[in-house]
Regions:
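Conserved S-adenosyl-L-methionine
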Residues: 1-3, 164, 169-172
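Charged, often flexible domain-edge or linker segments that flank or initiate folded functional domains
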Residues: 1-17
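SAM-dependent nucleic-acid methyltransferase catalytic core
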Residues: 17-152, 156-166
Length: 175
């Protein structure tokens, strides 16, 4: 979204991403009963396969369309998780038949594709041309050269009880 000043997702793009595709079953096979219900895992696999098959675009248009797709998918995945976290197996919080005193149940019960469409719409609304050349990069902070107006850092979650540097990243974030 930082660099993209004109490429938006179309309704045809959305239809293509939501088409049936059984090419992958990675999430379904590896994360059953951990984060999402079986049909939701299959939905994630379907959308991932369709994102990877967006080869009817090229260059930056393809790059930006995929970025919007991943953004919407990742946001939909986050919003469907209890407390938006992936560090524990707590699908039961969503599936338990108990009275709830907070509004997340409505969000959790809403279909993935509806969240996905909403985040596509949100991303499209944030595509604009400010007349400046914006650049986003994904490199080590130690390799950044030049002068920048904004630097966003997203360090991993650290485990303060780790015995060495290889154990510092919390192993509970496999998804």
């Amino acid at each position: 979204l930082i660099e993209n000043n004109k490429v938006r997702f179309t309704s045809e793009d959305l239809i293509n991403l939501l088409k049936e595709n059984n090419q992958f079953n990675f999430v379904y096979k590896n994360f059953r009963d951990i984060y999402y219900l079986d049909y939701e895992n299959k939905w994630i696999d379907k959308v991932m396969a369709n994102i990877l098959n967006m080869n009817h675009y090229t260059g930056t248009e393809l790059e930006y369309k995929k970025a919007i797709s991943y953004y919407a998918l990742f946001q939909a995945c986050l919003i469907k998780r209890p407390f938006n976290l992936f560090h524990r197996k707590n699908l039961y919080i969503r599936t338990n038949k108990v009275e709830r005193e907070f509004g997340n149940k409505i969000t959790w019960d809403k279909a993935f594709h509806l969240h996905f469409k909403n985040f596509i719409k949100e991303a499209n609304e944030h595509v604009f041309d400010n007349g400046k050349k914006c650049k986003a990069t994904n490199i080590s902070v130690f390799d950044i050269k030049g002068k920048y107006d904004l630097v966003y850092l997203d360090p991993p979650y650290l485990n303060k009880l780790a015995n060495n540097e290889h154990e510092t990243v919390d192993p509970g974030y496999p998804f």
